[in-house]
């Protein structure tokens, strides 16, 4: 079982010290802040035969079984493949587990992540377990996007917000996790991850700073008419679509903010500030607003794993982006 992260200590002191437990909890917050580690730590305490406020004892039979991955009263439900939905028959297996008697005579614990990966049928199948608790069972649901959950799911859980850690705590942790990276690089990684330290660590492993430099260089060449949309779109094959749409949404928002305030502060990372200012001065606000609306719609499709033609989607994005300067 994972240890909790330093920024979770205050939250754990609330959760771990409870004498009575609800049937279901929803831990929600941004991705990359350690909600899974917190849920696993809590699950271990709930299953432990000699629990303390700090967590599980780590020595009893239940803790030993959990460490070995063979605890009969612990059920983890997650997509069978990364980025795939949780299927209804997986949830039916969970329901079957919930109605069974605990084999060790204590409570049963279910960990489900991410809850938004359930489609409507899977979520409806889960509702029965949420509506009709069976024995001493605790369900721990984790969500990175709670707005995508059915209201009936959320209403049957005790909802616990897991906030983004402060920048100082995140940078301190990143400095230990990535000791070879200079402070400036860590700050850039944290900014690129939206302030989520675990996401920053993951993106570092994917070469996000190099990907960002490639994309920024391409955007500048596009605006200077040194490259066309089609070859540029193809050259970005290694850059994840969610990252691309996050960046373009941020840049478009920066353009709008600059048009309204002419404030050069708050325009994001230095690599795109001059481009944002240029587009803010040269683009019609209605055109920028239309671009932002389109980006947000497409970003949602990307996040929902819609079946999209990647190159055509990026070509459409780049054609619109290149047309921003000018009347309209």
UniProtKB/Swiss-Prot annotation:
Gene Ontology CC, one term: DNA polymerase III complex
GO biological process: DNA-templated DNA replication
Matching InterPro entries: DNA_pol_HolB, DNA_pol_III_delta_C, DNA_Rep/Repair_Clamp_Loader, P-loop_NTPase
GO terms, molecular function: 3'-5' exonuclease activity; DNA binding; DNA-directed DNA polymerase activity
Catalytic reaction(s) noted: DNA(n) + a 2'-deoxyribonucleoside 5'-triphosphate = DNA(n+1) + diphosphate
Pfam families: DNA_pol3_delta2, DNApol3-delta_C
Alphabetical list of SUPFAM superfamilies matching this protein: P-loop containing nucleoside triphosphate hydrolases
Enzyme nomenclature, EC number: 2.7.7.7
Protein purpose: DNA polymerase III is a complex, multichain enzyme responsible for most of the replicative synthesis in bacteria. This DNA polymerase also exhibits 3' to 5' exonuclease activity.
Name this protein carries in UniProt: DNA polymerase III subunit delta'
Gene: holB
